[in-house]
Structure formats: structure tokens, C-alpha cells
């Protein structure tokens, strides 16, 4: 068994404005046994200075890696190779998640022996004032194919590591 229940991989490029809010939402998750893998994809802004503060404050939880720019897919692939969790989650560095998200996903995955657990999401305006529920993912049973492949989003799911470690994201995308 791995040390962590969930490894969360965050590719980082040009997000110094958002990365603190993202990391705050992850270090404060109600699921304690998580590993946060931050992959700096060669960003030139001050994101790494912010990341370093979190690594120092949460050394058992936040891990930072710096690599040459290869795009979001390349950074996710790199992060997956570092992951030690039983499940893998992905968060975009300009996003944040609700504090119970990974606990709920993990508990559902374990209780139902799932390879993938999926949750809904909100679309939030730049000023954080307008939250709109994205209904596309709310009823998985009604729309399984679209939930898995329609949006091609990875940030509202956890995947059993044994499933995704055999796959790779395309590099040089975004």
C-alpha cells in the first residue's frame, strides 16, 4: 500500500496570480493522507517563489519539481511519475477546489471499489462573485459517456493509479 491515499498533480505555468488560492484549497483538504505534486513547467513568473513557501510550510504534503517547458500534458506526465498515492487527482493551477472534495471522492472510490470517481464543478468568475454549477457532470448515471469523455477534463476526478500510470497526456498541448 502506498503512503498516500491521493496524489494531486498540479502543472504550473504563468499563474502567480492564482497559485496561492489553488494551493490553499489543497493543503486544507479534509482528507489528510494526500500528496500535492507541483510541477513547474518552466514558468518565468514568480510562481516558484510562492510554491517554495508551501513546500517549506508543508514539507510532508507539498512536493515541488521544476522541469523544462513542455506543456501541460508533459507536466502532468512528469508529476504522475513522482506520485505515490493509490489514486491520482489533477488540478489546474488557476483553479481551486472545495475542502472536502478529495475526501468525498476517495471515500466513494473505496466504498464502491471504483477505478474513477467523478464530481461536479462550478464555473467561477474572475472576481469570484459568480458561481455557476456545471450541470454536465451532476448526473453521471444518465450520461456516462459524456461524463468520462465529453469535456475531457481531468480536474474533477480521481483515478486509480494502476489505471492511469499506463497512459500519457499529449505533450506540447497548451
PLM-predicted stretches and their roles:
Residues 100-131:
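Conserved donor NDP-sugar-binding/catalytic core segment of glycosyltransferases
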Residues 143-174:
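Conserved nucleotide-sugar donor-binding catalytic segment
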Amino acid at each position: 500500500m502506498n503512503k498516500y491515499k491521493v496524489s494531486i498533480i498540479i502543472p504550473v505555468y504563468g499563474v502567480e496570480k492564482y497559485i496561492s488560492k489553488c494551493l490553499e484549497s489543497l493543503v486544507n483538504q479534509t482528507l489528510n493522507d494526500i500528496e500535492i505534486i507541483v510541477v513547474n513547467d518552466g514558468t518565468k513568473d514568480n510562481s516558484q517563489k510562492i510554491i517554495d513557501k508551501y513546500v517549506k510550510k508543508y514539507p510532508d504534503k507539498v512536493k515541488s519539481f521544476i522541469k523544462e517547458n513542455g506543456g501541460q500534458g508533459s507536466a502532468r506526465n512528469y508529476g504522475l511519475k513522482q506520485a505515490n498515492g493509490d489514486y491520482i487527482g489533477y488540478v489546474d493551477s488557476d483553479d481551486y477546489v472545495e475542502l472536502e472534495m478529495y475526501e468525498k471522492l476517495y471515500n466513494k472510490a473505496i466504498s464502491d471499489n471504483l477505478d474513477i470517481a467523478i464530481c461536479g464543478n462550478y464555473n467561477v468568475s474572475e472576481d469570484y462573485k459568480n458561481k455557476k454549477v456545471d450541470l454536465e457532470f451532476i448526473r453521471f448515471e444518465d450520461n456516462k459517456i459524456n461524463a468520462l469523455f465529453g469535456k475531457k477534463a481531468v480536474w474533477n476526478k480521481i483515478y486509480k493509479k494502476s489505471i492511469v500510470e499506463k497512459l500519457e497526456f499529449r505533450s506540447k498541448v497548451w
